[in-house]
């Protein structure tokens, strides 16, 4: 049964890819949805056996790579962390498959779409169940490939081509860091198996275990953790390598829901949680993680407030929430981070699928400024979007409230510079999150309509196959946090005993529960309320004042700064990409490939031999005394060298003769 959880999506993808022509669009949808749904049912059974009954399971299939000291096998590890991710991935993927049956019904290439969705799910399951870094890396690269295929599903659109290539290239940076981290792990531990590495982590955390670089020693565990974290930065869209995430909206909306809620972006958070025994012995790496996560949450929240594309606003909210998960790991509370990941999957999938219903009803229009007044036309979709938005901002007693507020309280009770930095940036991000969430609701559903009459006349609410996943996700967005809080992050729980590791000095969960002042606990709620009030005022009360501010010099520059995403794309394109392209052409291609390599290679050798042949041909004059003179000269030089060899060797290094000969050969070039 455990292996079927992983294999079933692969079978569905195989059937859709190779037999889609015979099964037809509806047959492919039924087969793939059935396979993923069965996988989700088995995941629920595995959750009961592994997590609730505390019975971790390890399955070793067969050896994979065996070479001298390097050994990697096909193995599957099912512990509490794994089964939580299995639940999230398979359930959300099942709902996305059901939703896509109706959403993609008019697309002629829907069999290919379902094939990609299923293979995406398979690679994510391979990633979370792997028992070694090599198998994890296989799933890691697989979800990158599947995301490229899904973002570029409508491959005739140039923007989809650009977005897919951008996602692939930016993730290559993070993947390179992860690959170096895996190599570092093997260098230190002589294995890539999680169980062996984590068991030996404390022994190798001493300062005398280091990597030597540029004659400087660097703590080995810290270097490995930083490199692994670079991989997470790329995959989980942290600041610096985040620019691919908003552009990934060029794919179909169900793809966005799957990428942002269950797969791809959650892989980085999962990997940090999986490697918690390593990160716990590297305080410096944890500080870096905390700062990067806090800055990401703040950056993405401020960027989302002035985006006009419906899906991009939700995409930046994903980026911001990932920042919360990352800095929760940075303050050594991996359980709360994974809990927030699970809660986030519910309301983020709900938001994206609700946005898909709006786009579907509005004839593929995504600009919120061209919507408005849809609450009366799409009451069901409006209710679903409202539930998702309230859960996102942490409205009391909804799912998001039980994890986001705990993360902020933990950051406050860390009592360190990094903890305070994360708390205040996270709290300010709550204000901006509330602002752009209510701005989205106002512009899309409550503001006076700006739509074309023909679009409004054809506007319709979600059909039944699209409504069922929305209803189930709405229940999850309301109740999951309340139902799972005590089990996953309650005081004294041993839910994570077989998967996560926290040093005793980093345990602050009990302190955050009882030592946090009441005013600190109320700050997120106050900021959420303030953000919603400001959003209402800006869009309904002081609209003329905002227009005057926006058209002023300062206001226009501020608007451009946030609307253009802090100019990250401009910096990357104008300074980094252009510089690398210029270097590649001027130096690598012209100076090296067509320059030095050609001179020292085929062109230079042929040119030199041709010139030498021309010079030697002049010696062949046809006169015997010329030949006799050359023979005498050569014999004299030969005898002189033999006789004076000891004297010459004393003054000239023999190894320089090769350089002299080569220089003589190329002296005429």
Swiss-Prot record:
GO molecular function: NADH dehydrogenase (ubiquinone) activity
Protein name, as recorded: NADH-ubiquinone oxidoreductase chain 5
Enzyme Commission identifier(s): 7.1.1.2
Gene3D superfamilies: 1.20.5.2700
GO biological process, one term: ATP synthesis coupled electron transport
Top-rank taxon: Eukaryota
Compartments reported by the entry: Mitochondrion inner membrane
Membrane topology, as annotated: Multi-pass membrane protein
A GO CC annotation given for this chain: mitochondrial inner membrane
Enzyme class name: translocase
Pfam families reported in the protein's UniProt record: NADH5_C, Proton_antipo_M, Proton_antipo_N
Lineage: Eukaryota, Viridiplantae, Streptophyta, Embryophyta, Marchantiophyta
Similarity field: Belongs to the complex I subunit 5 family.
């Amino acid at each position: 049964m455990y292996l079927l959880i992983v294999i079933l999506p692969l079978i569905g993808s195989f059937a859709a890819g190779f037999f889609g022509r015979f099964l037809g669009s509806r047959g492919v949808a039924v087969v793939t949805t059935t396979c993923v749904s069965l996988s989700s049912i088995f995941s629920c059974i595995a959750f009961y056996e592994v997590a609730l009954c505390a019975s971790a399971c390890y399955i070793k299939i067969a050896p994979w790579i065996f070479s001298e000291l390097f050994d990697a096998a096909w193995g599957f590890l099912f512990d509490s962390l794994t089964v939580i991710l299995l639940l999230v991935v398979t359930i959300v993927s099942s709902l996305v498959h059901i939703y896509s049956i109706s959403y993609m019904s008019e697309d002629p290439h829907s069999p290919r779409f379902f094939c990609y969705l299923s293979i995406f799910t398979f690679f994510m399951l391979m990633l979370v169940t792997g028992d070694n870094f090599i198998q994890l890396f296989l799933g890691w690269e697989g979800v990158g490939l599947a995301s490229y295929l899904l973002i570029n599903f409508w491959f005739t659109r140039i923007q989809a081509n650009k977005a897919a290539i951008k996602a692939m290239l930016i993730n290559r940076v993070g993947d390179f860091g992860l690959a170096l981290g895996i190599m570092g792990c093997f260098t230190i531990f002589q294995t890539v198996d999680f169980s062996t590495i984590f068991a030996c982590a404390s022994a190798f955390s001493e300062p005398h275990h280091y990597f030597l670089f540029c004659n400087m020693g660097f703590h080995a565990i810290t270097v490995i953790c930083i490199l692994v974290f670079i991989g997470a930065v790329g995959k989980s869209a942290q600041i610096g390598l985040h620019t691919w995430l908003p552009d990934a909206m060029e794919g179909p909306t169900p793809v966005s829901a799957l990428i942002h809620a269950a797969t791809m972006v959650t892989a980085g958070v999962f990997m940090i949680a999986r490697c918690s025994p390593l990160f716990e012995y590297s305080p410096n790496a944890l500080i870096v993680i905390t700062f990067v996560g806090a800055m990401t949450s703040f950056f993405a929240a401020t960027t989302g407030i002035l985006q006009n594309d419906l899906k991009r606003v939700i995409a930046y909210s994903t980026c911001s929430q990932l920042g919360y998960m990352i800095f929760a790991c940075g303050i050594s509370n991996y359980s709360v981070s994974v809990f927030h990941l699970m809660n986030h999957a519910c309301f983020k999938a709900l938001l994206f699928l609700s946005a898909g219903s709006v786009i579907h009803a509005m004839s593929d229009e995504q600009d919120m400024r061209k919507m408005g007044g849809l609450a009366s036309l799409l009451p069901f979709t409006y209710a679903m979007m409202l539930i998702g938005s309230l859960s996102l901002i942490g409205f009391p007693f909804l799912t998001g409230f039980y994890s986001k507020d705990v993360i902020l309280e933990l950051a406050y009770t860390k009592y360190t510079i990094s903890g305070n930095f994360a708390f205040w940036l996270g709290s300010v991000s709550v204000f901006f999150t509330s602002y752009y969430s209510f701005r989205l609701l106002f512009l899309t559903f409550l503001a006076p309509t700006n739509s074309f009459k023909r679009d409004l006349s054809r506007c319709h609410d979600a059909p039944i196959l699209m409504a069922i996943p929305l209803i189930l996700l709405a229940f999850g967005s309301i109740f999951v946090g309340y139902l799972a809080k005590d089990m996953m992050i309650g005081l004294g729980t041993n839910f994570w005993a077989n998967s996560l590791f926290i040093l005793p000095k980093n345990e602050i969960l009990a302190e955050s529960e009882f030592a946090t002042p009441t005013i600190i606990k109320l700050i997120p709620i106050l900021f959420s309320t303030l953000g919603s009030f400001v959003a209402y005022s800006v869009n309904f009360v002081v609209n003329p004042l905002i227009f005057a501010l926006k058209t002023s010099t300062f206001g226009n520059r501020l608007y451009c700064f946030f609307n253009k995403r802090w100019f990250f794309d401009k910096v990357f394109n104008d300074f980094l990409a252009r510089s690398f392209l210029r270097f590649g052409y001027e130096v690598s291609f012209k100076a090296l490939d067509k320059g030095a390599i050609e001179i020292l290679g085929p062109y230079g050798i042929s040119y030199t031999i041709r010139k030498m042949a021309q010079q030697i041909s002049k010696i062949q004059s046809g006169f015997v005394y010329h030949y006799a003179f050359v023979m005498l000269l050569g014999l004299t030089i030969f005898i002189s060298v033999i006789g004076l060899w000891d004297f010459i060797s004393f003054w000239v290094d023999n190894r320089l003769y090769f350089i002299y000969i080569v220089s003589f050969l190329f002296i005429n070039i």
